């Protein structure tokens, strides 16, 4: 199953890459945007996690554990091995490939995101990405400012790290996307923003939180531990006017 998905992604990326720069107003999650948590194998929770603003989904796996004590806020629902979850996973695969095919404005390989202030754009890491401390995303007065981060392998945050958006809209993390080539791990006490689209798995350690975003794993598991995730409404394409020309580092470490 995993090999088939990877081959499908390669085909989609190849077709998307040539046109991505022209149409990159936002990353369309499709029906995956209705999920705060989406995984393929298992969703496992420990402690009093609170999931709000989206469904919890699993496909093709069948094991969701830890709810309760975890809470899924109404009116959102669990979709386990059903047609809704399967379609969301298919849409996630398409969104992941689209994000991976965007042309990056700046290569940050080998640099820690902590201490940086970045403007809207697409940023890439050939392999892993690390966040230690605070990453500031400056939307420069544009409520629809788009930030895309492409990682060849892992995304890891140190304990008590944070992503902060300034000069943006009321729900700033809604247009921040993290395309992770393998797995993502949010360290204890991390305060994060944006949608994590991981090819494999996502782990949120104790008291790591996502304000305005989601955790979406294509082939693996999502593991939670006393977390809060608040998803947001993904904007329609017709309401977006952002161009991806640009992107830059305002202030380094």
What are the roles of these predicted feature ranges?
Residues 236-253:
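A short, hydrophobic C-terminal helix/tail in secreted or cell-surface proteins
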Residues 12, 16, 235-236, 240:
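Intrinsic disorder/low-complexity segments
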């Amino acid at each position: 199953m995993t090999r088939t998905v990877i081959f499908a992604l390669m085909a989609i990326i190849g077709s998307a890459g040539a046109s991505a720069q022209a149409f990159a107003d936002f990353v369309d999650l499709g029906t995956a945007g209705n999920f705060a948590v989406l995984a393929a194998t298992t969703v496992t929770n420990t402690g009093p996690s609170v999931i709000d603003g989206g469904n919890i989904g699993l496909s093709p796996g069948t094991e969701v554990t830890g709810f309760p004590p975890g809470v899924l806020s109404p009116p959102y629902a669990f979709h386990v091995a059903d047609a809704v979850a399967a379609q969301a996973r298919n849409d996630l695969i398409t969104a992941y490939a689209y994000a991976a095919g965007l042309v990056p404005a700046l290569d940050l390989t080998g640099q820690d995101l902590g201490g940086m202030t970045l403007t809207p754009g697409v940023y890439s890491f050939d392999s892993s990405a690390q966040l230690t401390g605070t990453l500031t995303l400056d939307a420069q007065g544009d409520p629809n400012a788009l930030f895309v981060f492409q990682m060849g392998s892992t995304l890891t945050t140190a304990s008590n790290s944070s992503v902060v958006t300034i000069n943006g809209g009321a729900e700033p993390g809604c247009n921040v996307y993290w395309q992770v080539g393998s797995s993502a791990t949010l360290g204890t006490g991390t305060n994060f923003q944006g949608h994590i689209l991981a090819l494999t798995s996502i782990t949120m350690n104790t008291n790591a939180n996502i304000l305005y975003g989601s955790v979406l794993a294509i082939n693996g598991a999502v593991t939670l531990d006393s977390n809060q995730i608040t998803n947001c409404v993904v904007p329609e394409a017709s309401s977006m006017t952002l161009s991806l020309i640009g992107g830059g580092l305002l202030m380094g470490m």
